[in-house]
Regions:
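Long, charge-patterned amphipathic alpha-helical coiled-coil/hairpin "stalk" segments used as oligomerization
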Residues: 89-130
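RNA substrate-binding interface of SAM-dependent RNA methyltransferases
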Residues: 1-87, 148-157
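Structured adenosyl-cofactor binding patch, chiefly the S-adenosyl-L-methionine
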Residues: 120-158
Length: 158
């Protein structure tokens, strides 16, 4: 299992399927803390209840906030990362650094639910990181799976 201190957040989506897929991906790859923020339309009315059912059945936690700053205020992570495309990222995913931080406290990783997913203001709310393996934009669910798989490998090896 990935650390109980990992908080995976999906921000700014209007797709109920994307919300459900994000939750299923997190739970399927051993992340138990699934967070949603700025979820609108059918994603909020249908996607969140579907995701909540899946997460709770798997023994996980699902939280819902109106914005990223609310997540940070309520959960007080020691570090916040924004998982973005190479175009917006400042450095590749620092897996070893994240593993060390998870031993010390909560780490929030935010994934944008639409393209580009995060506003300029939101990009300043954490450290922007990208997946080195990805050479062009991929969907946020694939990016989440890539991140969690890479993190799991580093945790197993440490």
């Amino acid at each position: 299992m990935i650390s109980k201190n990992l908080l995976m957040a999906f921000h700014n989506s209007h797709s109920r399927k994307a919300v459900k897929y994000f939750a299923d991906t997190c739970i399927g790859l051993s992340c138990r803390n699934v967070i949603f923020s700025k979820i609108t339309s059918s994603a909020a009315s249908i996607g969140i209840p579907d995701a909540q059912k899946s997460v709770l059945k798997a023994g996980g936690n699902l939280l819902f906030f109106s914005d990223i700053t609310d997540i940070q205020e309520a959960l007080e992570p020691s570090k916040s990362y924004l998982l973005v495309s190479r175009k917006y990222g400042r450095k590749s995913i620092p897996y070893n650094e994240i593993v060390t931080e998870l031993k010390l406290g909560k780490v929030l990783v935010i994934v944008g639910g639409t393209s580009p997913g995060l506003t300029r203001r939101e990009l300043d709310l954490g450290e922007c990181i990208f997946a080195d393996e990805v050479i062009s934009d991929i969907n946020p669910i694939a990016l989440t799976a890539l991140f969690l798989t890479g993190l799991s490998k580093v945790i197993k090896d440490s």
